[in-house]
């Protein structure tokens, strides 16, 4: 697609293509002949057209004769977006086979699905942080002492209140390892189970 510029005409296609290649490879203009260098400098001073925007500057088309030099931004259909969002709600990360399967279902490439998921994760993270809903780690689960109902491989059917020696618990674990509330709860449950 020709640039809209007074310095550009249809005969400049070769110069323009060369300029794009030099820009992409970061080659200095000083390696060019002086008459071509001046045209490259004029081209480099122009604002990029829609086809040369920084978003699209990375990938050149494999077909040099096709008027388009850059890949355009892909707009997904409502059905594709719906399916991507539905799957994202189920699973925030997809394995390669899952990506390929989803891509084939909604007629996208696995790379497009991967990038959509990356962008959507970032979008959700940013939205959470803006709302002050930053994910806080859950507190670690509370440790609770459980009464031993088996002793030496045999069920403890005759467990009595005197078996709860204040110095040690039946398994030989020091009393200090359990909170007083946990032991009281265990004593109450043991008495309830065996005396009622």
Swiss-Prot record:
Keywords: Developmental protein, DNA-binding, Homeobox, Nucleus. Forebrain and midbrain. PROSITE patterns: HOMEOBOX_1, HOMEOBOX_2. Defines dorsal-ventral domains in developing brain. May play a role in defining positional information along the anterior-posterior (a/p) axis and the dorsal-ventral (d/v) axis of the developing nervous system. May be involved in determining positional or boundary information rather than determining a given cell type. Its main location: nucleus. One of its GO terms (biological process) is cell differentiation. GO terms for cellular component: nucleus. Residues 69-128 bind DNA. It is found in: Nucleus. The lineage of its organism: Eukaryota, Metazoa, Chordata, Craniata, Vertebrata. Belongs to the NK-2 homeobox family. One of its GO terms (molecular function) is DNA-binding transcription factor activity, RNA polymerase II-specific. SMART domains: HOX. Residues 48-72 are annotated as: Disordered. This is Homeobox protein XENK-2. The keyword Ribosomal protein does not apply. InterPro entries: HD, HD_metazoa, Homeobox_CS, Homeobox_NK-like, Homeodomain-like_sf.
């Amino acid at each position: 697609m020709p640039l809209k510029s007074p310095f550009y005409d249809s005969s400049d296609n070769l110069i323009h293509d060369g300029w794009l290649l030099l820009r992409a490879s970061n080659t200095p203009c000083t390696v060019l002949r002086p008459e071509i260098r001046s045209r490259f400098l004029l081209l480099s001073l122009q604002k990029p057209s829609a086809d040369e925007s920084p978003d699209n500057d990375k990938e050149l088309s494999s077909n040099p004769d096709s008027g388009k030099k850059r890949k355009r931004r892909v707009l997904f259909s409502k059905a594709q977006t719906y399916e991507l969002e539905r799957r994202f709600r189920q699973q925030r990360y997809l394995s390669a086979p899952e990506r390929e399967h989803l891509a084939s279902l909604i007629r996208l490439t696995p790379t497009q699905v991967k990038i959509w998921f990356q962008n959507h994760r970032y979008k959700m993270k940013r939205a959470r942080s803006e709302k002050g809903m930053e994910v806080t780690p859950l507190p670690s689960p509370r440790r609770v002492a459980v009464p031993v109902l088996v002793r030496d491989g045999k069920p403890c059917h005759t467990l009595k209140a005197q078996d709860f020696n204040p110095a040690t618990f039946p398994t030989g674990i020091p009393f200090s390892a359990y909170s007083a509330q946990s032991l009281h709860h265990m004593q109450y449950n043991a008495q309830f189970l065996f005396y009622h």
